[in-house]
Amino acid sequence: MGRAVKVLQLFKTLHRTRQQVFKNDARALEAARIKINEEFKNNKSETSSKKIEELMKIGSDVELLLRTSVIQGIHTDHNTLKLVPRKDLLVENVPYCDAPTQKQ
């Protein structure tokens, strides 16, 4: 697969992730859209293979971080936030254990 195709694929993946993570939050959706587009536009003329690979790694890491670590919070009161976790965030939830076992 060509490098341009991989870059475009990452661009689309970041936008899809943005839409899932910031669903129903117009301000965050717009800010993320602008930032993604800005970063890709700023590096559009990059020709160094090493630099492009580095930038793609950063983009992939950002996508993973957004997908696995960001949770929405909605202000419900003056000092209260309602957290809205996505289902994919709760998949690897490990229950609390008072007596952890030793690793062997």
From Swiss-Prot:
Listed GO biological process terms: cellular respiration; mitochondrial respiratory chain complex III assembly
TM helices/strands, residue ranges: none
UniProt GO molecular function: protein folding chaperone
Keywords: Chaperone, Disease variant, Mitochondrion, Phosphoprotein, Primary mitochondrial disease
Positions carrying Phosphoserine: S60
Disulphide connectivity of cysteines: none
Compartments where found: Mitochondrion matrix
Highest taxon of the lineage: Eukaryota
One GO CC term, this protein: mitochondrion
Signal peptide residue numbers: none
Disease (UniProt): Mitochondrial complex III deficiency, nuclear type 8: A form of mitochondrial complex III deficiency, a disorder of the mitochondrial respiratory chain resulting in a highly variable phenotype depending on which tissues are affected. Clinical features include mitochondrial encephalopathy, psychomotor retardation, ataxia, severe failure to thrive, liver dysfunction, renal tubulopathy, muscle weakness and exercise intolerance.
Stated role: Assembly factor required for Rieske Fe-S protein UQCRFS1 incorporation into the cytochrome b-c1 (CIII) complex. Functions as a chaperone, binding to this subunit within the mitochondrial matrix and stabilizing it prior to its translocation and insertion into the late CIII dimeric intermediate within the mitochondrial inner membrane.
Quaternary structure and interacting proteins, as annotated: Interacts with UQCRFS1.
Family named by the database record: Belongs to the complex I LYR family.
Protein name: Complex III assembly factor LYRM7
